[in-house]
Amino acid sequence: MLQKEVGAMNSVYVVGIGPGGRDQMTREAEAALERCSVIAGYTVYIDLIKDRYADKTFLTTPMTQEAKRCRMAFEEAQKGRDVCLVCSGDAGVYGMAGLMYEIKEAYPDVDIKVVPGITAATGGAAVLGAPLMHDFAVISLSDLLTPWEKIEAR
């Protein structure tokens, strides 16, 4: 499933590692992390997985350095290395997948493969015994990277 084809482009796997517990990481996410020689991510998320992948090279950035983190992942892939960029929850739900696709334009020789994960919303709902049903919607209330006025308008 995650095997590189002969002549394939260099790749960055944007990997959702789930809401935090090892048992909440998908098999596909684990396979990508095993396959890649470089794992990039937010320092806190790297700390969650570092002990399981001690033979890897880790690249970290602090909060609010998301664009820099993406560029680091692309630059490592350009060197011919398989790279995982990890995010909590699902890579496409408040994760790094969107930003990676935006920045990819500057790195046409690198392919992006998104590996989905269990979202914090669905993981939390399961813990609480509160299924998300009937027109479920998610709106982030974090104003760390989005102005509050934009959040209120949503």
Across the structure, where does each feature detected by a protein language model lie?
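Class I S-adenosyl-L-methionine
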Residues: 2-113, 118, 123
